[in-house]
Amino acid sequence: MLDDRARMEATKKEKVEQILAEFQLQEEDLKKVMSRMQKEMDRGLRLETHEEASVKMLPTYVRSTPEGSEVGDFLSLDLGGTNFRVMLVKVGEGEAGQWSVKTKHQMYSIPEDAMTGTAEMLFDYISECISDFLDKHQMKHKKLPLGFTFSFPVRHEDLDKGILLNWTKGFKASGAEGNNIVGLLRDAIKRRGDFEMDVVAMVNDTVATMISCYYEDRQCEVGMIVGTGCNACYMEEMQNVELVEGDEGRMCVNTEWGAFGDSGELDEFLLEYDRMVDESSANPGQQLYEKIIGGKYMGELVRLVLLKLVDENLLFHGEASEQLRTRGAFETRFVSQVESDSGDRKQIHNILSTLGLRPSVTDCDIVRRACESVSTRAAHMCSAGLAGVINRMRESRSEDVMRITVGVDGSVYKLHPSFKERFHASVRRLTPNCEITFIESEEGSGRGAALVSAVACKKACMLAQ
């Protein structure tokens, strides 16, 4: 009897593995993704192909990195998800002559009606938060330089002027797309009239992360975010940035690689679960690469896999609870928690119980395998993108062996128990002639925006002299 049961369990797990095998990407697959990514990057940088390229390669107008000679108080704002952060950053000289960056910050959550109402409502809410923050720190009387981290696709015309191309990550505020974001912020501050600000720079969160990490490691020339969404930036040779005049030096380019796949480059790798996630998203057919990797979608992918296993009678005796059939019920943090389970399955059991399920030991093991399959594919898919960027940098610099540091931020990268190890190992396999160091950014996007502002202010002072 016991043998029969054991045999049945073994057969069940075997069938599960056959279904999950679709998530495995071979080295050849990753090399294919990498070379397609490089091709799209090239198309994004070139004037004649930029418009139709899926990877937009947006120039950021960030040309120089901080040298540690900027001092002063700066305010920075960070808008990139459902939370909005205001931060006071003091850049100064620390003990023993080294540079110090001190921060105080406060988080504000963005109400749904501000995210999906009008641009005026959204920016009025943002300026209300700034006003509240300045009151708390008794800084209303000071006109501070402000750096704005704005993590959406923007076509820059200068460091402090950028047009929003399109909202992502569930934002839909009308009247913002096609407009200068810094202008919308300045208008909202003017409408309030109870404080003054000098908006000197707007940067993407990847850029802010790179600049923030540059303070710790002078070889940091790539910034990457793996959180709600996924994106990267890097220092490109100016001669390759055809959208901006001039051939000298380097400029930071925001790849906006989340949109890779929008022209069919990923079609052969998309599974039925990806198509379902895409169809029920706020932006069907867009940001397909990001939807394979980002935390906004990872839990939902797992939920759809679990439903498939239930339908195949391989999980929960073929019966799903009402909660499990509800979109968004399996949160991305559950993926991290399931994979962090110590082996006694207690954590997995608790999560499944909250979803109205009564799992067996085998059920718990199968759910863990489903989570591992989805998150490992995300790490490997992401590694192909970064390897594409790094190999491109090495080739354009004609270096036999390139040493480079990548600054990384984002909840998936930081909080998932094995994402970063799987990701690092895969990137290194795909970049044999590079020595890569990864550093995690601390409060990266706020500090980074302030440091970009500090560089801009320093330059303005030098030009004025």
Swiss-Prot record:
Principal location listed in the UniProt entry: cytoplasm
InterPro entries noted in UniProt: ATPase_NBD, Hexokinase, Hexokinase_BS, Hexokinase_C, Hexokinase_N
Gene3D superfamilies attached to this UniProt entry: 3.30.420.40, 3.40.367.20
Pathway: Carbohydrate metabolism; hexose metabolism; Carbohydrate degradation; glycolysis; D-glyceraldehyde 3-phosphate and glycerone phosphate from D-glucose: step 1/4
Residues binding ATP, per UniProt: 78-83, 228, 295-296, 332-336, 411-415
Activity regulation (UniProt): Subject to allosteric regulation. Low glucose and high fructose-6-phosphate triggers association with the inhibitor GCKR followed by sequestration in the nucleus.
Region (Hexokinase small subdomain): 67-203
Official protein name in the record: Hexokinase-4
Record keywords, A-Z: Allosteric enzyme, ATP-binding, Cytoplasm, Glycolysis, Kinase, Mitochondrion, Nucleotide-binding, Nucleus, Transferase
Keyword match Kinase: yes
Domain Hexokinase, chain residue ranges per copy: 10-454
Function field: Catalyzes the phosphorylation of hexose, such as D-glucose, D-fructose and D-mannose, to hexose 6-phosphate (D-glucose 6-phosphate, D-fructose 6-phosphate and D-mannose 6-phosphate, respectively). Compared to other hexokinases, has a weak affinity for D-glucose, and is effective only when glucose is abundant. Mainly expressed in pancreatic beta cells and the liver and constitutes a rate-limiting step in glucose metabolism in these tissues.
Assembly behavior: Monomer. Interacts with MIDN; the interaction occurs preferentially at low glucose levels and results in inhibition of hexokinase activity. Interacts with GCKR; leading to sequestration in the nucleus.
UniProt region (Hexokinase large subdomain), positions on chain: 204-443
GO MF: ADP binding; ATP binding; D-glucose binding; fructokinase activity; glucokinase activity; glucose sensor activity; hexokinase activity; magnesium ion binding
Annotated EC: 2.7.1.1
Family classification: Belongs to the hexokinase family.
Gene: Gck
A Pfam family it matches: Hexokinase_1
Enzyme class: transferase
Residues noted as binding substrate in the record, renumbered to the chain: 151-152, 168-169, 204-205, 231, 256, 290
Tissue-by-tissue expression: Expression is restricted to the liver and pancreatic islets (at protein level).
TM annotation in the entry: none
Coiled coil: none
GO cellular component: actin filament; basal cortex; cell cortex; cytoplasm; cytosol; mitochondrion; nucleoplasm; nucleus
Catalytic activity: a D-hexose + ATP = a D-hexose 6-phosphate + ADP + H(+); D-fructose + ATP = D-fructose 6-phosphate + ADP + H(+); D-glucose + ATP = D-glucose 6-phosphate + ADP + H(+); D-mannose + ATP = D-mannose 6-phosphate + ADP + H(+)
Compartments reported by the entry: Cytoplasm; Nucleus; Mitochondrion
